[in-house]
Regions:
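A surface/secretory-pathway sequence property marking extracellular, secreted
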Residues: 408, 412-468
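Short beta-strand elements of extracellular/lumenal beta-sandwich folds
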Residues: 384-413
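Bacterial Sec-dependent N-terminal signal peptides
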Residues: 1-31
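Disulfide-rich extracellular domains of secreted proteins
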Residues: 28-366
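Short, solvent-exposed loop/edge segments of extracellular or virion-exposed proteins
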Residues: 371-380, 424-427
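Low-complexity, intrinsically disordered segments enriched in Ser/Thr together with acidic residues
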Residues: 323-330, 457-497
Length: 538
């Protein structure tokens, strides 16, 4: 929206008086509904996407859409333009409609969250004003379903009897049932025709979170609010509840989707305000090939600098709604373990209304391995001798990108062997074990214990930084561990061909909060049937 200023001295003085008297009210009114915590928050194998379309478009004067006036180089907008309904569905009962495609990764996708937003500019004497909280949605050529926002309507007075509004409602079940493909939204309440002060506009957007078990884990967060940015102003918000991994991310490891109402392709930087219309993430202005740094909010629907074409109508300038996805893994200040993102909006003399933000950041889960080896103190090994010492070494590391928590090793001793008391040592482990340290067998405060359960002897070793008796510690990426203990073969060892012994390491990751497990087996003895041992949880 282009803001016009009076040049007469009296008018300027009056304007200054009004702004001074009501400056506090004006600033606070810019945030119509604040961005609180995320409306969706999860760590899952999957990600998010956002799609939508305009519901109004400018005509060329001959009844056709002004398709060629859009895009980055737009010279006209919806201000004082004749805006008419888009209606693509061919259904008599709808007065407007447009479609866009939900594109999902290959394979099986489960929709975990889907929320539909719609809105526009409307007069309170418009016959559809009372219905602004209701729209219709369908998949492909199926039957329409009614979506009612209830009380979930945000709006602000623009001038006189004209309002900017958005409404929203959960449609997770509907999208999960219907899956990927073309969705049409109809009967969005807006005003048509020509008006100044920004022009008429309308549209819809659908934000979707999906789970796909073939994909890596991601931290997915969705936020929404309703903010008015206008008149050469800036507005800052902070999005909390983020869950960045503990190690740096690559450019493609994090992406942001955002939606805003009423951005104009023809209003950008001026000599008075060279910054133009922008969005900054942690202090860095976001831009790409179709969203210039001085006019990010320009009516585009895009992904990483390319226009999205899977929509009907497929316009370059929606003249009322921006839906843009951008990689933000590098260059936008998302540091390891960040829990918040600072966003700043600015404008030249445009007016726009930021709404949805969604972030997906690839998690860096741990990958903890366990290897087990055994040697005998009798070389060469021809057969297992009576009362022979077997020396077991358990080792491994965290080869993943995230920290492993609560790391515990459990080793169930085969019934044919006898643990050698006092032989348990931690040879190396984070948290101060740079050299071999013998541990007591008692269940006490140190990092190891030996006990018996239902006739089975087992060892528990708590490893990692912060490990104490009864509680495993943390293995950071690239950290390793090594423990060792001894067992004796029985007096009748000549009757054994071999002995198989399995150990297990368990723990959890916080990003996502999932358990992990890895086993290692050591086999000793000439070829023959191993003595099996079943792992027992303690």
């Amino acid at each position: 929206m282009k803001i016009l200023f009076f040049t007469k001295k009296a008018a300027v003085l009056l304007l200054v008086f009004i702004l001074t008297a009501f400056s506090i009210t004006q600033v606070s009114a810019q945030i119509i509904r604040a961005y609180a915590g995320p409306v969706y928050s999860d760590n899952l194998k999957g990600g998010h996407t956002m799609f939508g379309n305009a519901i109004l478009q400018r005509t060329s004067g001959n009844g056709t859409f002004a398709v060629g006036t859009g895009g980055v180089t737009a010279t006209v907008g919806n201000d004082n333009s004749d805006m008419v309904y888009i209606d693509v569905d061919g259904v008599v009962s709808t007065f407007n409609s447009s479609s866009a495609d939900l594109v999902l990764p290959a394979g099986t996708n489960t929709i975990k969250f889907a929320r539909l937003y719609w809105g526009g500019r409307i007069d309170d004497d418009n016959s559809n004003y009372a219905n602004r909280g209701t729209v219709s949605i369908r998949k492909a050529a199926g039957a329409y379903a009614t979506v009612n926002a209830g009380v979930q309507i945000d709006q602000t007075l623009l001038t006189g009897d004209q309002y900017a509004y958005q409404a929203y409602q959960d449609v997770t079940a509907f999208v999960n049932t219907n899956g990927a493909g073309s969705y049409t939204v109809a009967n969005v309440a807006t005003t048509t025709g020509s008006v100044g002060g920004g022009g008429n506009y309308g549209g819809w957007a659908l934000v979707v979170v999906y789970e796909n078990l073939t994909l890596p884990y991601s931290s997915v967060r969705v936020y929404d609010g309703f903010v008015r940015v206008e008149n050469n102003a800036t507005q800052a918000i902070q999005l909390t509840g983020l869950n960045a991994p503990g190690t740096p991310v690559l450019a493609s490891d994090a992406y942001m989707s955002t939606m805003a109402w009423e951005g104009d392709g023809n209003l950008a930087a001026t000599a008075q305000n060279p910054a133009g219309d922008y969005i900054k993430v942690n202090g860095t202005a976001v831009s790409n090939a179709v969203n210039p740094i001085t006019n990010f909010w320009n009516g585009t629907i895009s992904k990483n600098g390319a226009h999205i074409s899977t929509k009907n109508p497929n316009l370059l300038n929606q003249m009322g709604i921006d839906i843009d996805e951008q990689e933000v893994g590098v260059g936008y200040g998302i540091d390891p373990n960040d829990t918040q993102i600072d966003i700043e909006f600015g404008t030249e003399s445009d007016q726009y209304f930021p709404s949805i933000f969604a972030f997906s950041i690839k998690s860096k889960p741990p990958l903890v391995t366990l290897d087990k080896a055994v040697i005998s103190d009798q070389i060469p090994l021809l057969a297992l001798d009576p009362s022979e010492n077997l020396i077991y070494t358990i080792s491994g590391n965290n080869g993943g990108g995230g920290a492993a928590h609560s790391c515990v090793i459990v080793d169930t001793i085969p019934s044919a062997l006898t643990y050698v008391p006092g032989s348990l040592k931690i040879l190396a482990s984070p948290g101060g074990f740079a050299s071999p340290v013998a541990k007591t067998d008692a269940i006490d405060g140190d990092q190891a214990q030996v006990a018996t359960f239902m006739g089975k002897t087992y060892l528990k070793i708590f490893i990692g930084t912060g490990a104490v008796g009864g509680t495993g510690g943390v293995l950071q990426p690239s950290e390793s561990y090594t423990v060792q203990f001894k067992c004796l073969t029985p007096p009748n060892a000549n009757n054994l061909n071999s002995v198989s012994n399995t150990a297990r390491i368990t723990g959890t990751s916080t990003d996502p909060n999932d358990p992990f497990v890895d086993d290692g087996t050591a086999l000793i003895g000439p070829l023959g049937s191993p003595l099996s041992v079943k792992m027992t949880s303690f």
